[in-house]
A protein has these predicted regions:
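Residue-level signal for discrete positions within transmembrane alpha-helices
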Residues: 17, 21, 29, 57-64, ...
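Residue-level recognition of oxygen-bearing side chains
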Residues: 9, 73, 90, 139, ...
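Juxtamembrane non-transmembrane "cap" segments at the membrane-aqueous interface
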Residues: 84-102
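Short membrane-interfacial helix/loop motifs at transmembrane-helix boundaries
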Residues: 1-12
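Rossmann-like NAD(P)(H) cofactor-binding subdomain of soluble oxidoreductases
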Residues: 70
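Phosphate-coordinating loops and pocket residues in cytosolic domains that bind phosphorylated ligands
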Residues: 5-6, 56, 87, 172, ...
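Transmembrane alpha-helix termini and helix-breaking/packing motifs in multi-pass membrane transporters
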Residues: 75-78
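Alpha-helical transmembrane segments of integral membrane proteins
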Residues: 18-51, 67, 80, 97-233
């Protein structure tokens, strides 16, 4: 159908806004995978010790707070107070977006060797992606920790330690590889949840993706885009 507000085709609008949501979700799941796997491994290696308790406390802290609250706090601290990161949009207002190839600014700027646009797109992307990643952080951390503990108790790990292999080699090459299979499954499942849950984050950071599009369409009572995005999700 056609938008009642912009008189633009809904399919055309979805194609225009989808890359922003996809880029945000990919960055968020990458951050969640890195942070969650690291915390899960540390928790397993230091079971029932300070790093274990600390990592679980940190994860619980960030997961317990609503994303919109964390988003505003991060904007105030890292954006306005410290000035480390921008707090809205995908690029600076006066910056021309890189020529579209994939629609992902970070990828397109690299393909065009536009490193200024790449730096700007990464700095704009970091805060919303970090806030969104907290939604998947707990699941990835828990499943990594559980599978690491299970793998550490396997007979082949005990044998490798008995023959004198370095602990770093045992953990990195054998234990983590075995434990990461289940973690990878959880990461793929969380990707869909993050994409569907990006509405609040996109709205607060004024990120021009599907989440912001459906909020603006709802406020305007523009039913065609609402139905289109609902079908897509």
């Amino acid at each position: 159908g056609e938008s009642l507000y912009s008189r633009r085709g809904v399919a055309e609008s979805l194609r225009a806004f989808f890359p922003a949501t996809l880029e945000l979700t990919l960055a968020a799941i990458l951050l969640a995978a890195i942070l969650g796997t690291t915390l899960g491994v540390l928790s397993a290696l230091y079971k029932d010790r300070i790093p274990d308790h600390l990592s679980r406390t940190v994860v619980l802290f960030f997961v317990s707070f609503p994303q919109f609250w964390l988003a505003m706090i991060f904007q105030l601290i890292f954006g306005l107070a410290l000035g480390w990161f921008p707090i809205s949009k995908r690029l600076d207002i006066l910056m021309i977006p890189p020529e579209s190839i994939t629609g992902l600014y970070t990828v397109d700027s690299l393909l065009r060797l536009d490193f200024g646009a790449f730096k700007a797109s990464v700095t704009h992307l970091f805060l919303p992606a970090l806030v969104l990643s907290f939604g998947a952080l707990a699941s990835i951390t828990r499943i990594t920790r559980a599978n690491m503990l299970e793998a550490l108790d396997k007979d082949f790990v005990k044998m490798e330690r008995a023959v004198g292999l370095p602990e770093r080699l045992v953990i990195g090459k054998y234990v983590l590889r075995t434990a990461f299979i289940a973690t990878l499954t959880v990461i793929s499942l969380e990707f869909g949840w993050l994409m569907a849950g990006a509405v609040l984050v996109e709205t607060i950071f004024d990120w021009p993706g599907l989440g912001l599009y459906i909020v603006e369409s709802s406020l305007r009572m523009d039913f065609q885009p609402i139905m289109g995005i609902t079908i897509l999700y």
